[in-house]
Amino acid sequence: MGSSVTVSITNEIDLERIARILASALPSHAMIALEGDLGAGKTTFTKFLGAAIGIPSNEIVSPTFGLIHIHQGPTQFTHIDAFRLSGVEDLEQLGWDEIISQCGWVIVEWPSRIALALPDDRLTVSIEVTGETSRRITLFSESSRFDGAIDALLIATHGG
């Protein structure tokens, strides 16, 4: 069945708050599929998520041309931009099996490009542009491992 929560935000301060809440409640090993149109705030959200665990936000940039960036912090933080990937074959060349078997967080922007390779055990974060600075953020997972993160955001934004 899965669980989900949707939150409307009006600015980047709200986005940062959501990232901090999520960071405090994610399991130590997590796959995050980050969906949204170009300019929706996927990389900004990723910067805030990394900053919440002590990775300087200036170190987190879009890996569009490098495809993958690995950051060491209290939790290994692997950031992948799948926009330029053609599919699973390209992932194998990046060492996908090793990446997803390591402890830490794996954040994938443009997950639809590699949908067949994504594990079912993941959290999907969808960022929808609703205005110049406003967004609708939806967290969804079929896995009960992410119930704590979804519940934490639900409690923080809707009061339970």
Predicted regions and their residues:
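Hydrophobic anchor at the beta1->P-loop junction of P-loop NTPases
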Residues: 32-34
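Short phosphate-coordinating micro-motif centered on Lys-Gly-acidic
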Residues: 3-5, 91, 97-160
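Phosphate-binding P-loop
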Residues: 22-29
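N-terminal pre-Walker A segment at the start of P-loop NTPase domains
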Residues: 2-21
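Conserved lysine of the Walker
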Residues: 42
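P-loop (Walker A) phosphate-binding loop of NTP-binding proteins
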Residues: 37
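Short beta-strand-centered segment that lines the nucleotide-binding/catalytic pocket of NTP-utilizing
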Residues: 55-71
